[in-house]
Amino acid sequence: MYDIIFFNCGVNDAAAVTGANASTYAANLRRYVEEGGSVYASDYAAPLVEMAFPEFVSWQRNAVVNNGLLASKVGKPQTITANVTDPGIRAALGQQTIQVSFDLDAWVAMFGTAPATRVYIRATAEGAAYSLFGPGENFTMNNIPLTVGFDVGQGRVVFTSFHQERNINPDMQQVLNLLVFEL
């Protein structure tokens, strides 16, 4: 068994979350974590987390597309000052805030979390009601989770709304490194 499975943004998850075997994929992923595996998922891999672990995170819902793969893809491109809410991450960074950059439209946004979910990073961010035709009405998402983690059985899941690609800065990279080594 693998120790960690990474589901990066852009993973082709349509078959896994909408196909005939979607419930089987979700059950297998959940069992993997319950038996001690870890999952790291980012941005567009959110539907996999939502299907396998629905009780830990609530997702923003788009007023235009309220279900399906576009439903929680509401974040606008922006750089924001985010609060590091986890004491361990805050101590490792030596600071209480970091700059988080989103360089693309329609990033996946969380709305809230269950009590058992650990929130590492929070911020207020701008969103838009995206459709297949582009952005629509703008809105503000106040104090939303950007990075979370939760235990399931013997394993752990970490989800982050931001990428670790071209728009990453040193603070974002350090947070992600700390979280991956925690898995």
Stretches found by the model and what they are:
Residues 71-170:
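Catalytic beta-strand/loop cores that center a nucleophilic Ser/Cys/Thr
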Residues 56-71:
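Acidic, Ser/Thr-rich peripheral helices and adjacent loops at domain boundaries
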Residues 52, 169-172:
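A short, polar/proline- and glycine-enriched secondary-structure boundary/capping micro-motif
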Residues 33, 72-76, 183:
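Cysteine-dependent hydrolase recognition
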Residues 26-30, 108, 147, 176:
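Short amphipathic alpha-helical segments and helix-helix/interface helices
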Residues 176-183:
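Short, hydrophobic alpha-helical segments
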Residues 1-57, 154:
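Helical hinge/lid and interdomain linker segments adjacent to catalytic or ligand-binding clefts
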